[in-house]
Amino acid sequence: MTHAHITSWFIMIILFLIAVSMQRSGAAKANIIKMVLRLFYIITIITGLLLLHSIASISGLYWLKALAGLWVIGAMEMVLVAGKKGKSMAAGWTQWVIALVVTLFLGLLLPLGFDLF
């Protein structure tokens, strides 16, 4: 399940960057990419919940990582909505980078992640 989760959030990040790029250029197919991106939001959340459910003893850091992961998704939507409305995306991008760094750090730090830290 770990590999499915990692694959889903990796694809989600790539789709997000493609959606932002297409939205900025005014491409007509940007809405299709955004809908596929939202499908990957759901897949990532479900695989994350399954991973969280599989842990015998859930510490507070796992809950923090789950919240940070939801924050990443929320920040992605903030960037996309601000871009569509023609508003500044700086706050959304800042939140996205911070949330992504926190989530990746916790994911690599906790026992289910890779052994980098």
UniProtKB/Swiss-Prot annotation:
Membrane topology: Multi-pass membrane protein
Lineage top rank: taxon: Bacteria
Keyword Cell inner membrane: no
Signal peptide, first to last residue: none
Cellular-component GO terms for this entry: plasma membrane
Pfam families named in the record: DUF1516
Transmembrane feature ranges: 1-21, 39-59, 61-81, 97-117
UniProt-annotated location(s): Cell membrane
Disulfide bonds listed in the record: none
Entry keyword Transmembrane: yes
Keywords: Cell membrane, Membrane, Transmembrane, Transmembrane helix
Similarity field: Belongs to the UPF0344 family.
Protein known as: UPF0344 protein GTNG_0604
Organism: Geobacillus thermodenitrificans (strain NG80-2)
